[in-house]
Amino acid sequence: MLGSKSIISFEDARAKAKRKLPRMIFDFIEGSAGREIASDRNSEIFNDIFLKSKVLAEIKDPKLNSKFLNYSFDFPFGIAPMGMCDLAWPGADKNLAETAKKFNIPLCVSTAASSSLEDFKKWGKDQAWFQLYLSLIHI
């Protein structure tokens, strides 16, 4: 583990990654497609969201499971597509697939993943979905 006890926010994780990873790899991970407009808009929208916890509220038998396209998952979120994860940590793709399987959450495999969709299916069973990312340059 990379000292996860010292990471309590996204910014903590980002700062630690920036210190630990080679600059080229950090820049690849932090960047997004094209002019990064969608990424910037997502960040703006997420900055406007405030989650208020219900401290000491009685919640009996909470249900976090969800369904998507007739697939049942244990949590209402999954692992987003990320390209070249093995650059940052060898075996990261396999770890992501095994984690998705363990917690029964979906995993979307990037077109630019370090491993094949077949490998993700082998490691994570039916948790792996595929993001087809078309580039007009190659069409």
Label each region the model flagged.
Residues 137-139:
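Conserved small/polar residues in nucleotide/adenosyl-binding loops
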Residues 22, 79, 100:
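Conserved, mostly hydrophobic/aromatic
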